[in-house]
Amino acid sequence: MGGAALLVAGVGGCESNMTVRRGAPSILAAFEPPSPELAARMATDEFDASARYQGIQLLSTANFAGEPLYVDLFRKSTQDADPGVRAVAARALGTNGQASDALTLSPMLKDKDATVRLEAARGLQRLHNPEVVPALMNALNLAKEEDERVRREAALALAQYREPRVVDALITALDDESVAVNFGVRDGLRMLTGQDLGLARRDWQAWYRSTQTPFAAGTGYTFPVFNREKRIWEYVPFMPQPANETPALPAGLSPIDTAGAAQTAPAAQPAQTGK
């Protein structure tokens, strides 16, 4: 049985990514998602990159997306010739993969397409594997990564690693020319250390030199999630709802590694001005 046939045989229900169907018998039917069988065929359509993109997107949000058959499809699709497919595959693998899949996403931080690099950085926020720390540090480095969105997401991904080299890299990145990166770095440092010293590199350096236990007050790490308020039409019965997520630990990160010290830690330091 071919790969596409196996995928079709294994699907059970795609629950999101509504699309408008022309010729549907009713307004509700017009917004039904493609069938699981069609989504699987789309995801493996070797002639149509747009179909592969849509198929992977549909499968990645289904309730069976974490099954090995589909995770393997997402892995293979990270090598697709089309950058859009690589990007959506990176997103799917980050959402449904295992800690070891971080090693698949890590090389994608060097992809020539910025959107692929962005999705790889976001995916690495959801997969915990210390082997990818050097790649994330490079993605945070202004001299090595030109896209500020990638640098910001890399900063947030690094916040799950309680290592001195990570703190050093984040403090250095406070000098980044992008305000968005500055705030992402600050948020990462707050999660790691429990301190809130603002955006001034010198203040963080002074504190870091003064402490022997930089991670004692850490708040613990949960990956950033998508959340938004309902739009007016989403209050209509049967309309698709926002794909809001619940914060959680990355795959491979133990709760023991993220909790405990914060319960008895001193209060966070007040923010200071200057940079």
Predicted features along the sequence, with ranges:
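Conserved hydrophobic register position within alpha-solenoid helical repeats
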Residues: G55, A89, A120, A154, ...
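Short inter-helical turns and helix N-cap capping residues of alpha-solenoid HEAT/ARM repeat scaffolds
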Residues: F47-D48, A81-D82, K112-D113, E146-D147, ...
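Core register positions within helices of long alpha-helical scaffolds
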Residues: L58, A92-T95, G123-R126, A157-Y161, ...
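Bacterial N-terminal signal peptides
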Residues: G2-G10
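Bacterial signal peptide processing site
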Residues: G13-M18
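Amphipathic alpha-helical scaffolding segments comprising HEAT/armadillo-like alpha-solenoid repeats
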Residues: A30-A43, F64-Q79, Q98-K110, N129-L142, ...
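Pro/Ala/Gly-rich low-complexity, hydrophilic intrinsically disordered segments
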Residues: L197-A243
